[in-house]
């Protein structure tokens, strides 16, 4: 599979540099094509390392839900304990994702992600030794920190791939990483059964099973450290040491990010697409097990089908975002995002009202495609909000996903205030409501859903260089933003790039 940006018609300059890179690159040495089956360094190797590391972290974080019927019996977990554990698994990553964004801006995605992955792996191993509900909640909380590798994944892809294909790269990397949420629904029951067949009791088997995701999480971190590279031109630490890359002012990086209102809207909307996905990962196996009286492995297979849709749904969202951009520019990306996320919310609301097992499975599968595609569409927009504070904006958006999951589980799925069916329906309504602010995102150089570009003829260079003051420009600290502005002309769309703004 190869995705190629239409550089000529979008204003993106593509160059080929066979001596340095296997893929054609732009002025920032970002790849202008995406070759899925290549492992060429640095672009495609970074892609495969990032999605696999994120996949392993997702498997570890959600390894418990498919075994909950056994775990709750062993630890005497109440409905409140299970709800609190689900909330804990996604709440830790709220702070971690914000910090990860800043860490990527300052130290690079390679070191930042590997450090987090290694530091959270012990929580997965320690799950084998817990003896109380409090212990269960704590290990899920600390293991959930690893979900912040999502931010480093998106940052890394945005650093390696040019605008016309960045949506595809982000969507596929995140989608295949999120696939871990579905894969673990299959992996853990199978591992549990294998250990049981070797003679272990069920209360021992589930504990031993947690060493498998912990081991793979650890190995993925070492692979990133050994084989990864932060940027097309090298690693952050080496470029800082040689003077090729100046260290940015952390205060200004954070300030620019949080002052950009667009980042807050992407965080809100992402809270009710990815947040919904995280919530479903936590509740869906138990939901089908209890409501339709299924066997543990059968419920696990059905639940797995939701997460496994990430194999194509989220990548499809990213690819669709790039397609709409080539035809209609940034405005096309925004419209596609809103339509898909709203449709996902409608399907989610319907799911909670269906009492037939067969129809529930069908609606859940269609719903999974839309909600996961909406996640991919979100990160088709995020890379263009800020060049200087990309990590901060990515972190804010990613954290928004976890905040949405925490609030949803706290309000609708903690205790017995709502039935699971009612909670799922209300979650869908919230998703529809939180997609509405997407219409408020406006770029003066490109426009928004309902408005065209500013009458003041603001250019891409005006927008991205506004993040730097005159003193910083005199030191040439803005060069990266200037190059990014040149390649971002593609976001004007096919209808306007033939008549560039002046």
Swiss-Prot record:
Deletion consequences: Loss of plant growth and root system architecture responses to the rhizospheric Phyllobacterium. Decreased nitrate uptake in the high-affinity range.
Keyword tags: Cell membrane, Membrane, Nitrate assimilation, Transmembrane, Transmembrane helix
Bilayer topology term: Multi-pass membrane protein
InterPro entries tied to this protein: MFS (IPR011701), MFS_trans_sf (IPR036259), NO3_transporter (IPR044772)
Gene3D superfamilies in the cross-refs: MFS general substrate transporter like domains
Induction comment: Down-regulated by nitrate and by imbibition. No induction by growth on low nitrate concentration, but strong induction in mutant with disruption in both NRT2.1 and NRT2.2. However, this overexpression could not restore the nitrate influx. Induced under long-term nitrogen starvation. Strongly up-regulated upon inoculation with the plant growth-promoting rhizobacteria Phyllobacterium.
Single GO biological process annotation from the record: nitrate assimilation
GO MF term list: nitrate transmembrane transporter activity
Residue ranges of the TM segments: 51-71, 87-107, 111-131, 133-153, 172-192, 208-228, 264-284, 300-320, 334-354, 361-381, 393-413, 423-443
Main location group: membrane
Described purpose of this protein according to its UniProt entry: Nitrate transporter involved in the constitutive high-affinity transport system (cHATS) under long-term N starvation conditions. Predominantly expressed in roots of nitrate-deprived plants as a 150 kDa molecular complex with NRT3.1 representing the major contributor to cHATS influx. The principal role of this cHATS is to enable roots previously deprived of nitrate to absorb this ion and initiate induction of nitrate-inducible genes. Not involved in transfer of nitrate from roots to shoots.
Family: Belongs to the major facilitator superfamily. Nitrate/nitrite porter (TC 2.A.1.8) family.
Protein name per its UniProtKB record: High affinity nitrate transporter 2.5
């Amino acid at each position: 599979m190869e995705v190629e940006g239409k550089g000529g018609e979008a204003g993106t300059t593509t160059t080929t540099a066979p001596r340095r890179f296997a893929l054609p690159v732009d002025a920032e040495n970002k790849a202008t094509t995406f070759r899925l089956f290549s492992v060429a360094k640095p672009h495609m190797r970074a892609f495969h390392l990032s999605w696999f590391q994120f996949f392993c972290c997702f498997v570890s974080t959600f390894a418990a839900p498919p075994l909950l019927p056994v775990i709750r019996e062993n630890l005497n977990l109440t409905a409140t304990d299970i709800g609190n554990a689900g909330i804990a698994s996604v709440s830790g990553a709220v702070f971690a994702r914000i910090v990860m964004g800043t860490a990527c801006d300052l130290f690079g995605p390679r070191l930042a992600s590997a450090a987090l992955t290694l530091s959270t792996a012990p929580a997965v191993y320690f799950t084998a030794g817990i003896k109380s509900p409090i212990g269960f909640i704590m290990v899920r909380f600390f293991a959930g920190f690893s979900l912040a590798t999502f931010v480093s994944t998106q940052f890394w892809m945005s650093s390696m791939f040019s605008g016309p294909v960045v949506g595809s790269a982000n969507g596929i990397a995140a989608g295949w990483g999120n696939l871990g949420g579905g894969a673990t629904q299959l992996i853990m029951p199978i591992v549990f059964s294998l250990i049981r067949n070797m003679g272990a009791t069920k209360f021992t088997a589930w504990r031993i099973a947690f060493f498998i995701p912990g081991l793979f999480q650890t190995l993925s971190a070492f692979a990133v450290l050994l084989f990864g590279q932060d940027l097309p031109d090298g690693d952050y630490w080496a470029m800082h040491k040689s003077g090729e890359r100046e260290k940015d002012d952390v205060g200004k990086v954070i300030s620019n990010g949080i002052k950009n209102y667009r980042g807050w809207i992407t965080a809100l909307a992402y809270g009710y697409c990815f947040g919904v996905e995280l919530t479903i990962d936590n509740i869906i196996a138990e939901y089908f097990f209890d409501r339709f009286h299924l066997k543990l492995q059968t419920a696990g297979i059905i639940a797995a089908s939701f997460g496994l849709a990430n194999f194509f749904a989220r990548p499809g969202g990213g690819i669709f975002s790039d397609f709409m951009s080539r035809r209609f520019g940034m405005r096309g990306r925004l419209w596609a995002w809103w339509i898909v996320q709203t449709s996902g919310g409608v399907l989610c609301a319907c799911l909670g009202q269906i009492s037939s097992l067969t129809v529930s499975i069908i609606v859940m599968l269609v719903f999974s495609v839309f909600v996961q595609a909406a996640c991919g569409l979100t990160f088709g927009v995020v890379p263009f909000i800020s060049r200087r504070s990309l990590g901060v904006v990515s972190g804010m958006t990613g954290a928004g996903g976890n905040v949405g999951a925490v609030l949803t589980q706290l309000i609708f799925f903690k205790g017995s205030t709502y039935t699971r069916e009612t909670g799922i329906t209300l979650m869908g309504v919230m998703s529809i409501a939180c997609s509405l602010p997407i219409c408020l995102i406006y770029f003066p150089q490109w426009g928004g859903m309902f408005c065209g570009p500013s009458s003041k003829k603001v250019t891409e260079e005006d927008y991205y260089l506004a993040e730097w003051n005159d003193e910083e420009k005199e030191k040439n600290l803005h060069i990266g933003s200037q190059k990014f502005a040149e390649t971002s002309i593609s976001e004007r769309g096919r209808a306007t790039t033939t008549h560039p703004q002046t």
